[in-house]
Amino acid sequence: ISLTIDSDTVDEIYWIEEGKKLAIGTSGGIFNLYGSETSYTITPTNFSLIRDTSWEAADIKPARVGNAMIYVQFNRRKLRVLTFSGEDVQYESSEISYQADELVGKEVKELVYQKQPHSLTWCRLKDGTLASLSFEDTMPVVGWGHHTIGGTQADATLGNHAKVESMAVIPHDGRDQLWLIVKRDINGSTVRYVEFLEKFYEPSETDQELAHFVDCGLYKTASSFTTAQFAHLKDESIRILGD
């Protein structure tokens, strides 16, 4: 099936996401594609292609959260949430980043969604830091956080902190793990580490050794007053958690 979008502008298609109707993110807005009001099946002779909103999309894969979809606006400095209105039989787009202009204003480069144990949408920003969005489509509560990964990586434009270059979410042990590729300067060389975020500490945990959250942390089981395991942390500030 070959279809042409009927638009007053020449638009580039960036992504297509499934749903009750196909949502199509373009440089000219969000379109929905379906068969008809009585049959959603798309055929060469049975289709409808309608623009639901003129808020354009960026070339970044959106994140599906429940029955909603979070996508990056064309300028990469705003996030919008796309929901399907059964009453109007169309998608509706509203900004969800108005409380975090200083964060997402740094330009969003990538989105991933961590469903379990908490509903978190992670944004990789242009400066290599992360922004996290706490959001569930059934709850009218939104929260934002900013996360700078430990370590140094000299950059006259983006700053001297470590830079996250890529993200992925992988299911593991009944939860979702956020995996990162992090760029750092170590002993005069630029290196990249593959890291993952440990699970969040829950108040119900009885093991107090789990009550820490560190960057690129190492754990030593045997008692010792000296160690040679931390050469990669030369010139870095460290803290020791002792029991």
List each model region and its residues.
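Short acidic-glycine loop/turn motifs at beta-strand connectors
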Residues: 26, 34-35, 125-126
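Beta-sheet repeat architectures centered on beta-propellers
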Residues: 8-11, 54-57, 68, 75-243
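Beta-propeller domains
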Residues: 1, 33-43, 48
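Blade-loop segments of beta-propeller domains
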Residues: 2-13, 46-55
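Structured, hydrophobic secondary-structure cores that serve as assembly/anchoring elements
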Residues: 15-31, 54-82
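WD40 beta-propeller blade core
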Residues: 31-32, 131
